[in-house]
Amino acid sequence: ELIPSLLSGAGIVSMDQIDTSYEGTPQRFVTDPSIMQQGFGTNEPFVYENEISQWMKPVAFQYLHELGYSIYPEPITVREADVAAQADCLTKLVPILQRSQLDFLADPERTNALIVDLVDRYQTSWTYSAGAAEFSAQAQLDDGLVFDDPTSGVFGQIDGARIAETVATFVPVLKATGSLAADAVVDPETLYTTQFIDPSITAESVLGED
């Protein structure tokens, strides 16, 4: 309930508007479009407009980062104790990860085809069409979701001020919901390192200016 708690704490919604039983299908929204549903702005708008036969029209949406949910989503993490031991590997791996995301956005067709094929083969109940994949890659660019770190100009660089803001925003929420001990102390500086980042890799150099 982290996101609902954040939105409620900011006065955007009240907890009695929150339904945490969402099971991952569009049925809930289609039957009651007055609700606000959690999803991906790089996926659900396309799916509702093009693939949900009971809807087939645009939906309004807003990104949570515009409301204070300014995390680094799905970061690559390593246990602190393993950083030194795996330093040689990380020195080689991290620049590959930096560059691969940019290379994907520069030419997503081949990777998108592979993802769509794997989704179909594994049949995990997740669905993903070629149209949705194409929309997602383009939306990441059009909506300004992929960009160089504003402070350093490096792609993939962690901004310490942003981490500190995230900690300041979410630690009180985590404590209030019982997910974090009330006396817990979280030092933002201990949560990240830029040690293995290749500073020569930039979105501007690969994707060009907007």
Task: Label each PLM-derived region with a short phrase.
Residues 4-8, 49, 116, 171:
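Class I S-adenosyl-L-methionine
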Residues 85-178:
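Secondary-structure end/capping motifs
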Residues 23-27, 32-125:
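Pocket-lining segment of extracytoplasmic ligand-binding domains
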Residues 160-210:
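Conserved C-terminal helix/tail region of periplasmic/extracytoplasmic solute-binding proteins
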Residues 46, 74-76, 81, 145, ...:
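Flexible, active-site-adjacent loop/turn segments at secondary-structure boundaries
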Residues 3-17, 84-88, 92:
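Hinge/capping helix and adjacent helix->loop/strand transition within the periplasmic-binding protein
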Residues 7-21, 34, 54-61, 180:
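A local structural motif
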